Regions:
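Acidic, polar-rich low-complexity tracts and alpha-helical solenoid repeat scaffolds
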Residues: 1-240
Length: 240
């Protein structure tokens, strides 16, 4: 118990290397005891903090009386990645979330892992890397992450001039968004994309929606008036 207490003190002082040595001594020296299982549990927390879940699994498997279930390993792997994300350790979080997605393709936290990984890539201005992970979120059942994923997917697709794909996502965003600004963003870009595709009736329809919205900023209204005028010229309908 004294050795276990020593390890806990070292852990609380962030002396993780010393704590792991103490916990290992307890786990190896006093197998199958309550103290040994507490040492294993505390070691698990340290390995998660360090983002070294694989090392934890190898260590536990070396103990004849203990084992790590797939469910526990999955949970620990996700927790390790999420901790690095919350601590703003971008590179380490990216590595660990990628590891989780590869190791647990049917994992319970797969949606969160894809979304957080997308956010990390997006903030690092790696939009091409972020895109497939946002698209994964968009393809799943509606969640708290869907609207953000739709918004950023459309943004990335528009920037890369993938207008056909962007149109599909913008239509969803216009329908599903709860944030009025996101709906306005969707309608503004639907106006522009439809004009680009020579669907002038649709372009005018979205322009008129924008103009009827009292929250629309003046520069967006200016775009709408221009689209209506150009679309009217294209359709020989100067009365618009």
């Amino acid at each position: 118990k004294a050795l276990l207490r020593k390890g806990l003190i070292e852990y609380n002082q962030n002396n993780t290397t010393a704590a792991l040595i103490s916990f290992n001594t307890v786990a190896v020296g006093y197998p199958s005891t309550a103290e040994a299982f507490q040492a294993i549990s505390s070691s698990r927390s340290i390995y998660i903090d360090l983002g070294q879940v694989d090392s934890y699994a190898i260590w536990v498997k070396s103990l004849d009386y203990a084992r790590v279930t797939d469910s526990e390993l999955e949970s620990a792997t996700y927790q390790a990645a999420e901790k690095q994300y919350l601590d703003s350790n971008t590179n380490k979080a990216i590595k660990l979330f990628n590891g989780y997605i590869v190791s647990f393709p049917n994992g319970k936290q797969l949606l969160k892992a894809h979304f957080y990984l997308a956010e990390l890539y997006y903030k690092a201005t790696l939009s091409a890397n972020a895109l497939p992970h946002y698209q994964y979120v968009c393809s799943q059942a509606p969640s708290e992450f869907t609207e953000t994923a739709l918004f950023k997917t459309s943004e990335i697709l528009l920037e890369s001039e993938a207008f056909d794909e962007a149109l599909v996502i913008l239509l969803r965003l216009d329908t599903e968004a709860r944030n009025p600004q996101n709906r306005l963003y969707a309608q503004s870009n639907l106006m522009k994309v439809n004009f680009r595709f020579n669907d002038f009736d649709a372009a005018i329809r979205y322009a008129e929606m924008i103009l009827k919205n009292s929250k629309t900023e003046s520069y967006i209204k200016s775009d709408a008036y221009i689209i209506i005028a150009r679309a009217a010229m294209q359709t020989n309908n100067e009365m618009k």
